[in-house]
């Protein structure tokens, strides 16, 4: 049975600082819950919402209702949300495409104190594997809802015919984020698994090389795949992010 992933706002009565988490393309808040709970236990308030079109139970919604401009606004709205709740000091981390969006948001919003990108495609080259992963995610969602084979086939055809337009938007965002790297002034965290099947292996390092005037913390995770927040590397990732926050964010 499919259950729609919900936004989370993990509170801590002793917290004075907030962390915004952003999930990846075709992902949801589920991918960020382990990290969110960990950071809550360390004394932070943590907020994560689903990007528009995500987490609805209908993958076509990502294409119909989503888009880069909407998702950038979702990230800004998340910062406003925690500030409206009284937390003025904010850090931001994103996974995969969420990492690109977090980076772009930090380039534009200098009052975000620090943040980073986890498994982010700073080198974005689309392959058939990307499309198959997207269709695979969609079919997993449809099967969980017991959709008919005829309906799934029809929906798959729609996704294949329309995803490339959004891929072009993502490619443009990646290019602009790389070009805007000089605007980034905050301490920055980068993470990538050495067995990441979705990324070019030089992805994180390529962006690190653009940040000559920024304090950068860069970690690799041996034999770890793409979704570092939930795979076998998640404990190491959590502790590395905590150390980064202790150095750059903790009062």
Predicted regions and their residues:
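Short beta-strand/loop motif that positions the catalytic acidic residue
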Residues: 184, 190-192, 196
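Catalytic active-site module of serine/aspartate enzymes centered on a nucleophile-bearing elbow/loop
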Residues: 223-251
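Conserved alpha/beta-hydrolase
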Residues: 40-60
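Short alpha-helix in the alpha/beta-hydrolase fold that links the catalytic acid
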Residues: 186, 200-209
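Catalytic nucleophile-loop/oxyanion-hole region of alpha/beta-hydrolase
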Residues: 57-87
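Active-site nucleophile elbow and catalytic-triad environment of alpha/beta-hydrolase enzymes
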Residues: 163-180
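Gly/Ala-rich beta-loop-alpha elbow adjacent to hydrolase catalytic centers
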Residues: 94-98, 102
């Amino acid at each position: 049975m499919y259950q729609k992933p919900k936004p989370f706002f993990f509170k801590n009565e002793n917290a004075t600082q907030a962390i915004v988490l952003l999930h990846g393309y075709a992902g949801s808040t589920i991918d960020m819950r382990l990290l969110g709970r960990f950071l809550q236990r360390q004394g932070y308030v943590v907020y994560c919402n689903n990007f528009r079109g995500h987490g609805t139970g209908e993958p076509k919604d990502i294409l119909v209702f989503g888009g880069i401009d909407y998702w950038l606004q979702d990230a800004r709205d998340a910062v406003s949300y925690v500030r409206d709740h009284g937390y003025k000091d904010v850090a931001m981390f994103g996974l995969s495409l969420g990492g690109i969006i977090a980076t772009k948001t930090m380039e534009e919003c200098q009052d975000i104190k620090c943040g980073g990108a986890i498994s982010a495609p700073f080198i974005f080259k689309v392959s058939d594997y990307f499309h198959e992963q997207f269709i695979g995610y969609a079919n997993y969602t449809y099967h969980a809802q017991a959709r008919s084979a005829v309906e799934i086939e029809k929906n798959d055809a729609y996704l294949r015919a329309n995803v490339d337009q959004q891929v072009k938007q993502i490619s443009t965002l990646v290019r602009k984020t790389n070009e805007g790297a000089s605007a980034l002034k905050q301490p920055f965290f980068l993470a990538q698994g050495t067995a990441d099947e979705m990324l070019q292996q030089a992805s994180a390092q390529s962006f690190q090389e653009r940040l000559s005037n920024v304090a950068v913390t860069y970690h690799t995770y041996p034999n770890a795949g793409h979704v570092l927040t939930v795979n076998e590397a998640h404990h190491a990732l959590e502790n590395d992010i905590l150390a980064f926050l202790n150095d750059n964010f903790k009062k």
